[in-house]
């Protein structure tokens, strides 16, 4: 690669185009902060679904990444997901804040945030079992 800024800019655009092709092929999802979109750099790249995570590199699959991917995969068809603010995982549509929590996750209950909790059987208040989102798929 050339060290000139023009060549560097072309390279960045090519990489972003390749990432967009992967997203269009439904292999990855790009998560942006509210108000940003392609061709800007996404704040987070995620596999499109959890099966792809285990097929590409099954040795190092983090539980939190699996939970986040599951949540995003169940909602992305009908909703727009953005990077969440501090203390949240995602912002859905225009203001529903969700935090995805693994079993045993410690958090202060914020009434403005919905908590999707792994291994919770029955929901109450703003705490929703993560498995229920699977019915949206």
Over which residues does each language-model region extend?
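Conserved catalytic cores of phosphodiester-cleaving nucleases, focusing on short active-site segments
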Residues: 71, 75, 88-104
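A short, terminal or domain-edge coil/loop segment
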Residues: 83-91, 130-137
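Generic signature of intrinsically disordered, low-complexity segments enriched in small/polar residues
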Residues: 14, 21-24, 93, 117-118, ...
């Amino acid at each position: 690669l050339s060290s000139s800024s023009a060549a560097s800019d072309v390279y960045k655009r090519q990489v972003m185009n390749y990432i967009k092709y992967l997203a269009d092929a439904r292999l990855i999802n790009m998560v942006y902060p509210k108000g940003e979109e392609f061709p800007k750099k996404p704040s987070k790249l995620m596999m499109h679904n959890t099966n792809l995570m285990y097929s590409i590199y099954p040795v190092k699959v983090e539980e939190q990444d699996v939970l986040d991917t599951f949540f995003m995969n169940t909602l992305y068809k009908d909703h727009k997901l953005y990077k969440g603010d501090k203390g949240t995982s995602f912002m859905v549509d225009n203001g529903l804040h969700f935090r995805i929590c693994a079993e045993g996750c410690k958090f202060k209950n914020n009434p403005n945030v919905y908590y999707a909790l792994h291994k919770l059987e029955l929901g109450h208040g703003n705490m929703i079992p993560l498995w229920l989102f699977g019915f949206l798929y």
